[in-house]
A protein has these predicted regions:
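Substrate-gripping "pore-loop 1 plus following alpha2 helix"
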Residues: 114-127, 151
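Phosphate-binding/switch region of NTP-binding enzymes
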Residues: 129-151
Length: 151
């Protein structure tokens, strides 16, 4: 699993990366590993937003070693994209966060774009690309593989 984490492209500033996990446990592990890795590599803080209620799991998997940055984990159980984006932008601006990881990304389109998932994915992608390029940070979307929904 650690080799997989190191091979993930997406640690580039100003880029949105999508990653698919096999199950919810590996999703939490991937998020925690990437957050820890980014914190160590860049000596900066990382914001993780859990859209599927895995805040405690992610926090418990993040190594507690001394590092310059902090990993903030936000639990957003009712994911309306505009609310998630607004909260993320506020935290990024106030806390000097230089990477954003969103877990449970398949839920972003579920609420408002059920009838038009492709339109929802395009809308979300354009807003995340704007956030990523505008602030110069990587945005990483981690989702559990499900055939019927895709972000």
């Amino acid at each position: 699993m650690a080799e997989f984490i190191n091979q993930i492209p997406g640690y580039e500033k100003g880029r949105v990366q999508r990653i698919t996990a096999t199950d919810e446990v590996s999703e939490s592990f991937i998020v925690a590993q990437m957050a820890s890795d980014l914190r160590k590599k860049w000596n900066t803080s990382v914001l993780c937003i859990s859209l599927d209620g895995h805040k405690e799991a992610i926090e418990s998997l993040i190594p507690q070693e001394k590092a310059v940055g902090t990993v903030y984990v936000l639990d957003q159980n009712n994911p309306e994209f505009k609310v998630v984006l607004r909260k993320a932008t506020g935290i990024i601006n106030r806390r000097f966060v230089r990477a954003l990881i969103i877990s449970g990304a398949e839920r972003l389109t579920a609420k408002y774009f059920q009838n038009h998932p492709e339109k929802g994915r395009e809308w979300i992608a354009s807003h995340l690309e704007g956030l990523s390029r505008g602030m110069g940070i990587p945005v990483i979307l981690v989702r559990v593989h499900e055939d019927q929904s895709e972000v």
